Amino acid sequence: MAQSNMPHKSDVLSQDELRKKLYQTFKDRGVLDTLQTQLRNQLIHELMHPVLSGEVKPPSISVEGSALLIGASNSLVADHLQRCGYEYSLSVFFPESGLAKEKIFTMQDLLQLIRINPSSSLYKSLISGFDKENKKGFLMSFLKELAEYYQAKESCDAETQTSTTFPSQVSLAEKFQLIDAQFADGFPHRSKLESLETKLNEYKKEVQHQLQVEMCHKLKYFREAEITKVKMEERRKYEKELAEFQNEFERTCQAKNEALISQEKNSLERIKKHREMESKEIYAQRQLLLNDIALLRGREAELKERIETFELTQKLQEEKIKSEAEALERREQNLKNIEDTYDQKLKTELLKYQLELKDDYITRTNKLLEEERKNKEKTIHLQEELTVINSKKEELSKSVKHMKEVELELESVKAQFLAISKQNHLLNEKVREMSDYSQLKEEKVELQAQNKLLKLQLEETRNENLRLLDRITQPPPELVIFQKELQKTEKAMELEHKDFETHRQALEKQLQSEIENSAQLRTQIAEYDASVKRLTVQVAELKSQLKQTQIALENEVYRNPKHSLIHSLSGLLLSGKMAPHSEDKSGDFLNVPLEQNKVIAGAVMSRVPPYVNTATEASSPESDFEFIASSTKAKVRELEQEAERLEKAFRTYYQRATQNPSTSPQPAKSPPSVNSVAALRSIASSSMDRPVSAEDRVVSEQPLGDMLKEEMSDMSKAFMGSVVSRPRRTSSSTRLSSTPHPKSRRSLDNEMYLEGLGRLHMTSSSPLLDRVSASPAASPSPCPERTAQASPVPSRHSFSGLPEQNACLYQRQTETQDKSELSNVDKQSLKDEKFEPPFRWNKTEQFEAEGLHPAGDMPGIDFAVATQSSRLISYDYPSAVQSQTGEQDEQELWELHMKERRQREEQRHNERQEALERERRELGKLEQERRMIEESLKMEMEEELEKSVQDQKDKSAHCENTLEKYMKIIQQRQEESNADKSSKKSGKECSLVDMMMPSDKDESSPGFSHEEPDDMW
């Protein structure tokens, strides 16, 4: 390119050689492309503005048409140059035409401009050819299509002088020729001295170059044509293969569909069979479920009442929890407001500090400029100041670290403040519950001390912040860094707060799950209570049936009395089988009351005939009445025979007792009396195999000395006052209780033997005592108040004989007892705790020594009273029985009915109290669980706070503050106090549970008390 400026030097190198050498050097150095672009730009500028050369520039070709057509033609040319690989001309064309690569028109746009119909064959062939042959440009394909179109139409019938060439205004070749001519005019003409050889060589090269270009174009055209043919053939082959593949695929799909349809039919049949089986099973299960539902509906009706009460308690607890949550939210809002005020204060202080720093920085910069202008000698001084500034920077970094530590301490103080606020809230609630003013004052003093310490620490932190702000002497960029660090710390605090909230939510979920578990437990307890109530109802029905049978039996026996039964009973006690040996007669038989009581119990129980299926037969009282009447009439003869022996034995026994009054045991002092009472108790309790009730335990575990003294004195006075006019009629009831077995039924088991003994004693003692005090001519009982005070509780039991000692005493006492029992029920449960341990110890020692076990089913005075009353009745006044009238029998029956009604009312009252106490226990358990959960939450919160404080301590190199130590001491004290309170509460609740467990067992005990008296007959 630059060889035209160089003079011809035949001595050194020719033009061609120099051109080749320059080309090679530029190419090796990698400067060829840049040099070509520079030369192109220069050429274009010189052609456009040939100012330096004095020649006139050729006139520019005016292009007619719109800008859109010009852009379309330019895009056609650019596309053609790009497709053909004419990079040089393309690089020249883009800047000359003002066209950008992004603004080139697409083929669809060009066809739309030319207004070729999209449905025409030309449009379709151009688009298909462009898609297939991306190497060719739009211009080449368009010209090819036009040539083929016009070649097909060259043969015409009429000869016309028309050319098939496409007319155009100016071709590209003409433009290039004009450019070459202008370029040639710009350069100086070659010298005429050039040889013809050089010209010929140049022409040859040009011709060869043109031939090569033409050959290349022809080869490209030939290749493209062959490639299109091959592509068409391959496309046809692929279409055939695709059609075959589609057919095969459709066949396989049809076969698969048929197989699937058959499988579906089989599966549907199986499913139908399975559904039929399931429907049958479901129907059977449905019937079972309907039966269960019918049972459960009955339970639901009972459970609704308990659920309502539970919902009321739950609502109260929810209201308490809501109030606590509102208080916590208010405190959180207060804390947020305090934090906002602190943040605003910090921001204002930082702004003030920034302004001060800016002012200081401006003044210092001015001073430094003045000092630099004045003297160059102060450079050394400035260097020293730089060292000082560096040291200050280090101090600043240290202060920043210290600030971070202080902020961490602030966070810990805030967390501690939150914990302290929660503790204050809990302490306030405890103070409301306990109303301990001394503890309140102490806690207030402690909290005030804590607040003072917190305020002091906050003031110290503020002072430290102010000191650090005074120390900082750095330009604003460092302040920006410091603000970023503050923002990071605030974000970290927010993340920690979020973690704390998530943990709190998890703990609340645990609380809800535990509450649900407690609700399930309550439902189970309610079901258990319902089953217990059903059993109690059944037991009450059985009791009523048994009482009816007893009343019928007594009425039948009263109609057919036998007068000599009381004498037969007294004679039987000292007859051949029951009397002690000669060894015992020599040494006072009454001094061994335990053995005496054992012998009496064995004698009486050997004659107790059992009746089978009393519980089942009690459902029909008329049939029972007929059966018992027939059996009693048949056995009266046997009773008359044994009555004579009993009378003889009783008379001899009473004579020996009156002859030896000094050796008779006193129940207040002598331990054998206690042993005799314990013997009968152990027999009755072991025979019935049931737990001892709490009220019986109260009676049996009172101090026996005072009780036995009072009752024996009262009974002796009552007997002495009523001896004169005592009726003889009372022997009928003793005959009822002491009717013997026939000989065929005397070989019974030990269990029936002992059960009959217990029932015999209670039924025989109560009518005797009733007859002792029921005579109308007898003087009024001298000490009814003392007897009522000595035994207020046993009147509520079916086994107690003291309330049935006399009718007049009972009528006077019941009015006072019914009033006092309602208030004494809670007191008696507390007396159990007082009297139980010492008396149990004494009983176990005595009974283990004699091989017996304690039982609280009978009061200890029954046996002594029964023996004394039977003694007095049978010995002194044997003729008073015949003067008894039928009216007194009816009155006694009415009194028995009244007693039974009162006992039922008392039992109902006891059951209600037991239900209330159970509910109290359940509430106590729920409160205990809630407190345990709150304590666990407190412990977890405290552990988290301690962990955070320990982490902060590990990060900071400082020692523990006095405030933290003080807080730890307070927390330890609170934990110890909480542990002590929880242990006390758990101990109280355990004692209450121990107290109330016998009351739960009492529900089953009355069932035995009224079911088994029929065994006497």
Swiss-Prot record:
GO cellular component: centriolar satellite; centriole; centrosome; ciliary basal body; cilium; cytoplasm; extracellular region; nucleus
Keyword line: Cell projection, Cilium, Cilium biogenesis/degradation, Coiled coil, Cytoplasm, Cytoskeleton, Nucleus, Phosphoprotein, Ubl conjugation
Molecular function per GO: alpha-tubulin binding; gamma-tubulin binding; identical protein binding; molecular adaptor activity
Compartments reported by the entry: Cytoplasm, Cytoskeleton, Microtubule organizing center, Centrosome, Centriole; Cytoplasm, Cytoskeleton, Microtubule organizing center, Centrosome, Centriolar satellite; Cytoplasm, Cytoskeleton, Cilium basal body; Nucleus
Knockout mutant characteristics: Females die at birth and display severe craniofacial and limb abnormalities associated with disorganization of the brain, reduction of the lungs, defects in the great vessels and cystic kidney. Primary cilia are absent on the luminal surface of glomerular and tubular cells of kidneys. Males die earlier during development of the embryo, display failure of left right axis specification associated with a lack of cilia in the embryonic node.
Outcome (variant: S435R): Induces centriole elongation. Impaired IFT88 recruitment. Reduced ciliogenesis
Coiled coil: 188-557, 626-659, 895-966
Top-level taxonomic group: Eukaryota
Region (Mediates homooligomerization): 609-666
Biased composition (Basic and acidic residues): 897-988
GO biological process, one term: cilium assembly
Subunit-structure text: Homooligomer. Interacts with LCA5. Interacts with RUVBL1; the interaction is direct and may mediate interaction with the NuA4 histone acetyltransferase complex. Interacts with SDCCAG8; the interaction is direct. Interacts with MAP1LC3B. Interacts with C2CD3; OFD1 may act as a negative regulator of C2CD3. Forms a complex with KIAA0753/OFIP and CEP20/FOR20; the interaction with CEP20 is detected only in the presence of KIAA0753. Interacts with PCM1; this interaction may be mediated by KIAA0753/OFIP. Interacts with TBC1D31; regulates OFD1 activity in cilium assembly.
Function noted in UniProt: Component of the centrioles controlling mother and daughter centrioles length. Recruits to the centriole IFT88 and centriole distal appendage-specific proteins including CEP164. Involved in the biogenesis of the cilium, a centriole-associated function. The cilium is a cell surface projection found in many vertebrate cells required to transduce signals important for development and tissue homeostasis. Plays an important role in development by regulating Wnt signaling and the specification of the left-right axis.
Family: Belongs to the OFD1 family.
Protein name: Centriole and centriolar satellite protein OFD1
Gene that specifies this protein: Ofd1
